[in-house]
Amino acid sequence: MVVSLAGRDLLCLQDYTAEEIWTILETAKMFKIWQKIGKPHRLLEGKTLAMIFQKPSTRTRVSFEVAMAHLGGHALYLNAQDLQLRRGETIADTARVLSRYVDAIMARVYDHKDVEDLAKYATVPVINGLSDFSHPCQALADYMTIWEKKGTIKGVKVVYVGDGNNVAHSLMIAGTKLGADVVVATPEGYEPDEKVIKWAEQNAAESGGSFELLHDPVKAVKDADVIYTDVWASMGQEAEAEERRKIFRPFQVNKDLVKHAKPDYMFMHCLPAHRGEEVTDDVIDSPNSVVWDQAENRLHAQKAVLALVMGGIKF
């Protein structure tokens, strides 16, 4: 079966089949090899990506800009000051106007509804660079990394420890679609969205994977192949940071916790890391840590998304 993603939005990975996700991962792997051997892949010559940033980012901005450059296209950075949204122009009108100038839109937003509205009114593909609900590009890079290092995704025990946030949501969705055994451990009251839990359970039933939600990090990481964490307070939650530090302290990924995982476990973090909070130096800097490979794979995974949805490559 030929899979074409041309013209598709990428808002949430629940909208994609396992086959479509694998198409992205396989394309990303191909681009990574091509880059390593110096093979040109300027598949988006003359195309432009508008990048809307309501919130700043190192990895998202740099990886998307470099991805478009490698693909022969151009990335246009637009922050809140560059747009008329603050002066009353609607997201719908912004989407309509940008669609007349560019070939795709990537948006990093606070509210997931903003990226949904962009997609509703844009006539070009819209890519979610991060919202408060999901972070699909991160999950694609994460599972690309797991596939590279473990040789498979099916049956791999992926344990997320911390806040049931956007990163957890996308990790749950993609992992259960691809047949992983996904476990999420959070403090009570900080669980993932109920809707995402149901999706994960349904996905696992279809893929042969599994999903489990726990409140005990030690029990969760037992025999883990992958331990993943993220910051305890996301951007916009600064007022809660002190309270969250107290609540999440027992969920810190440290040398005592990782003893319960498999000896060859992988430590993952979407970065930036708050060292000494959600993870200690002796874990993130250990030989088990793959965070830098994971960060690099954002470039390759997003390059695949761009080439596929902007019509540069078809399978």
From Swiss-Prot:
Q: What is its EC number?
A: 2.1.3.3
Q: Outcome of mutating M30A, per the record?
A: Increased dissociation of dodecamers into trimers
Q: What is known of its domains?
A: The monomer folds into two domains of similar size. The N-terminal domain is the carbamoylphosphate-binding domain; ornithine binds to the C-terminal domain.
Q: What is the lineage of its organism?
A: Archaea, Methanobacteriati, Methanobacteriota, Thermococci, Thermococcales
Recorded hits in PROSITE patterns, A to Z, give: CARBAMOYLTRANSFERASE
What is this protein's function? Reversibly catalyzes the transfer of the carbamoyl group from carbamoyl phosphate (CP) to the N(epsilon) atom of ornithine (ORN) to produce L-citrulline, which is a substrate for argininosuccinate synthetase, the enzyme involved in the final step in arginine biosynthesis.
- Tell me what this protein is called: Ornithine carbamoyltransferase, anabolic
Q: Name the keywords, alphabetized.
A: Amino-acid biosynthesis, Arginine biosynthesis, Cytoplasm, Transferase
Write down the chemical reaction(s) this protein catalyses: carbamoyl phosphate + L-ornithine = L-citrulline + phosphate + H(+)
- List cellular component terms (GO): cytoplasm
Organism the protein comes from: Pyrococcus furiosus (strain ATCC 43587 / DSM 3638 / JCM 8422 / Vc1)
Gene for this chain: argF
